[in-house]
């Protein structure tokens, strides 16, 4: 019984640890509780031979109901950066490797003035947000766009080659990032969250749930109190009976206690043999 309880407690701790220590995993779709946020997937390939071209990345995302990443604003750019940072934490084995995003150039604009204006999002987004690296886009034969991810490379004129954008030839092989519509799952109504800006609420109204091991142990211990009392009563009864028997054995007959046998020879006076 004790072993089963230990296993259950260990499983609960592992689940809690998994909930608070979640990290981005390559190839895993990441969604958020807020249904307004899209879902994303970082497709990273450790082997260079497994990386794909722009068109292959685009088709891979579309085959799963998504699109190659479009970025609407700086906030979304920062979100992707934080996800890539979690993806490349020490010990994951993930290092350098740029990521295709869904920006590409239409037309054959060769002049530096017209070239940046010819880039459009492949999913039809009208976002004008750009995060080009210094002196990019270089145009020419480079029409598709990657997000730099080269943490071990020496910094260039624009700083580290991290998260800024660079145009590249569309047949080059890179990783890619997919973007999906928010996933909506039917759930039971959750408890109403408290609002910190309501002055009429007291601190007692803020606490709506209990968490941790101690509150859970209380719910386990309370039902066992009657059983513990029963065990204590049984032990007390057994001890009383054993003590009563031991006292009975220690008492002996008064006649037996006065009997003894002398080992010395008694000499009778006045008797001759």
Curated annotation (Swiss-Prot):
- In which compartments does the protein localize? Membrane
Q: What does this protein do?
A: May play a role in the development of the nervous system such as in neurite outgrowth and elongation. May be involved in motor axon growth and guidance.
Matching entries from Pfam families are given as: Lectin_C
Q: What is this protein called?
A: Chondrolectin
- Beyond the main fields, what else does the record say? Isoform 1 but not isoform 2 expression is down-regulated at postnatal day (P) 7 in spinal muscular atrophy (SMA) model motor neurons before onset of disease.
Q: Which organism is it from?
A: Mus musculus (Mouse)
Q: Which domain of life is it from?
A: Eukaryota
Entry-listed glycosylation sites = 86
């Amino acid at each position: 019984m004790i072993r089963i309880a230990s296993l259950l407690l260990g499983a609960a701790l592992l689940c809690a640890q998994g909930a608070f220590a979640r990290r981005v995993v390559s190839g895993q779709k990441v969604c958020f509780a807020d249904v307004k946020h899209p879902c994303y997937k970082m497709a990273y390939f450790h082997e260079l031979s497994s990386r794909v071209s722009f068109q292959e990345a685009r088709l891979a995302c579309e085959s799963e109901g998504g699109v190659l990443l479009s970025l609407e604003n700086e906030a979304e750019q920062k979100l992707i950066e934080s996800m890539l940072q979690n993806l490349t934490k020490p010990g994951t084995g993930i290092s350098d490797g740029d990521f295709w995003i869904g920006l590409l150039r239409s037309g054959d604009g060769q002049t530096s003035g017209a070239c940046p204006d010819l880039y459009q999002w492949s999913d039809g987004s009208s976002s004008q947000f750009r995060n080009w690296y210094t002196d990019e886009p270089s145009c020419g034969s480079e029409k598709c766009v990657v997000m730099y991810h080269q943490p071990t490379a020496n910094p260039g004129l624009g700083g580290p080659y991290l998260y800024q954008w660079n145009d590249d030839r569309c047949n080059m092989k890179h990783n890619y990032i997919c973007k999906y519509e928010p996933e909506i799952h039917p759930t039971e109504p959750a408890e109403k969250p408290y609002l910190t800006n309501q002055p009429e609420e007291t601190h007692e109204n803020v606490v709506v749930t209990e968490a941790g091991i101690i509150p859970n142990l209380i719910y386990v211990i309370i039902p066992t109190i009657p059983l513990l009392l029963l065990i204590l009563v049984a032990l007390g009864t057994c001890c009383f009976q054993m003590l009563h028997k031991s006292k009975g054995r220690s008492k002996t007959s008064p006649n037996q206690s006065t009997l003894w046998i002398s080992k010395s020879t008694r000499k009778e006076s006045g008797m001759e043999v």
